[in-house]
């Protein structure tokens, strides 16, 4: 009883899979050139990736902060560092060392 049922299911599965393999893909599926891009589009992607990747780490390269040296000076002064926690770095630096 089980063997004929199993054979029938296998035959049905074979017919379904064979029918799907023989069928030609439709226009939406074929997507002429969907796996490929033009040279111009490809070079734009590569340029974009090169611009934003750090070559050693493979991660986006951070933009240098122009205020980082001043922030370190303020952090080394305990009074400036404490004031920066309350009113912000730029205002604390201005009060201790002059304009930013």
Curated annotation (Swiss-Prot):
Post-translational modification remark: Gamma-carboxyglutamate residues are formed by vitamin K dependent carboxylation by GGCX. These residues are essential for the binding of calcium. Decarboxylation promotes the hormone activity.
Query: Which keywords appear in this protein's UniProt record, sorted alphabetically?
Result: Biomineralization, Calcium, Cleavage on pair of basic residues, Disulfide bond, Gamma-carboxyglutamic acid, Hormone, Hydroxylation, Metal-binding, Secreted, Signal
Which residue positions does 4-carboxyglutamate occur at? 68, 72, 75
Any Gene Ontology CC annotation:
cytoplasm
Localization terms from the record: Secreted
Q: Residues that bind Ca(2+) 1, according to the entry?
A: 68
Protein name as it appears in the record: Osteocalcin
Encoding gene, per UniProt annotation? BGLAP
């Amino acid at each position: 009883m089980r063997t004929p049922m199993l054979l029938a299911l296998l035959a049905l599965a074979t017919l379904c899979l064979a029918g799907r393999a023989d069928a030609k893909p439709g226009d939406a599926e074929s997507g002429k050139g969907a796996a490929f891009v033009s040279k111009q589009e490809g070079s734009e992607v590569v340029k974009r990736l090169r611009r934003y990747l750090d070559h050693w780490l493979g991660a986006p390269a951070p933009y240098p902060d122009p205020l980082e040296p001043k922030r370190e000076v303020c952090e080394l002064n305990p009074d400036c560092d404490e004031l920066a926690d309350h009113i912000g770095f730029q205002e604390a630096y201005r009060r201790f060392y002059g304009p930013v």
